[in-house]
């Protein structure tokens, strides 16, 4: 069961958040509709464990405590504030850098402050688990990301465009945008100069306007694809420019 939540960035709300100590990243995930459905489910059924996927759903912890006796486990996919701190560090002086500082500092306060509110934490890497243990006595284990290999058959090169480069990812996530922006401005001109026949394909949900309307030689902006695995098998080499990140880059594992 799913409840649709509007996660679009609203400029007015984002601006007003500058005068708040709350994390705008987290505030975007708060939904009255989702809260009502969650409470209904908790009242209708009993659970031993409620697993919260990422810190962005932690605002619902009080509702879970009130309507359930279940233990609450946080599944931590990343150390979220470190991603935004690194983006801030890679940004030149100016209004954008000041805004990014507000984002990562408010997110840090929330992320570290919420750790003691849960009964257990499942980090996605050992490194993340060690970091989190520095800030809480709550039990922490590291459980890596896994895939069902039967869903990823042995690749063949029958329908693969050789040579070709590609990137796939959610393009409404700023670290992905910043990585691609760097690759197109710093790396791609050199690649194209030496391999003028090579094409670079960009795929992913919520492709931003600057990519859809931009032009770079031999760069093909596809946008959302129906089958990510089929798309990856149709191209040769995956490009994953990382300027800021934490946890595990799932798409790299899937591409392997």
Language-model-derived ranges and their functions:
Residues 41-43, 114, 230-234:
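Structural alpha-helical scaffold elements that stabilize or flank donor/cofactor-binding regions
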Residues 119, 233-247:
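Acidic donor-binding loop of glycosyltransferase active sites
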Residues 38-58, 71-73:
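Short N-terminal targeting/anchoring amphipathic segment
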Residues 71, 81, 100-154:
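Donor nucleotide-sugar binding/catalytic pocket of nucleotide-sugar-dependent glycosyltransferases
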Residues 7-24, 28, 72-109, 170:
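Acceptor-binding helix/loop patch of EC 2.4 sugar-transfer enzymes
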Residues 134, 142-234:
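Conserved catalytic-core segment of nucleotide-activated headgroup transferases in glycan assembly
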Residues 229, 250-256:
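Short alpha-helical segment that forms part of, or immediately flanks, the ligand-binding pocket
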């Amino acid at each position: 069961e799913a409840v649709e939540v509007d996660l679009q960035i609203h400029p007015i709300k984002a601006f007003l958040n500058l005068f708040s100590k709350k994390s705008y990243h987290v505030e975007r995930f708060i939904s009255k509709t989702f809260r009502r459905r969650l409470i209904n489910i908790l009242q209708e059924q009993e659970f031993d464990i409620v697993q919260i996927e990422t810190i962005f759903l932690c605002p619902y912890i009080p509702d879970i405590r009130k309507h359930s006796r279940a233990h609450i486990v946080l599944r931590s996919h990343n150390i979220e504030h470190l991603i935004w701190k690194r983006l801030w560090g890679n940004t030149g002086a100016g209004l954008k850098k000041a805004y990014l500082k507000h984002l990562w500092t408010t997110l840090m306060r929330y992320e570290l402050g919420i750790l003691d509110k849960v009964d257990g934490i499942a980090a996605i890497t050992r490194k993340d688990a060690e970091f989190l243990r520095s800030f809480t006595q709550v039990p922490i284990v590291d459980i890596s990301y896994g895939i069902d290999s039967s869903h990823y058959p042995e690749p063949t090169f029958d329908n693969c465009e050789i040579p070709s480069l590609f990137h796939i990812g959610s393009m409404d996530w700023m670290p992905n945008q910043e990585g691609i922006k760097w690759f197109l401005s710093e790396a791609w001109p050199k690649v194209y100069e030496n391999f003028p026949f090579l094409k670079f394909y960009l795929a992913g949900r919520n492709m931003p306007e600057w990519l859809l309307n931009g032009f770079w030689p031999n760069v093909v902006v596809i946008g959302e694809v129906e089958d990510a695995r089929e798309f990856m098998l149709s191209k040769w080499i995956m490009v994953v420019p990382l300027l800021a990140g934490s946890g595990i880059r799932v798409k790299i594992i899937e591409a392997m």
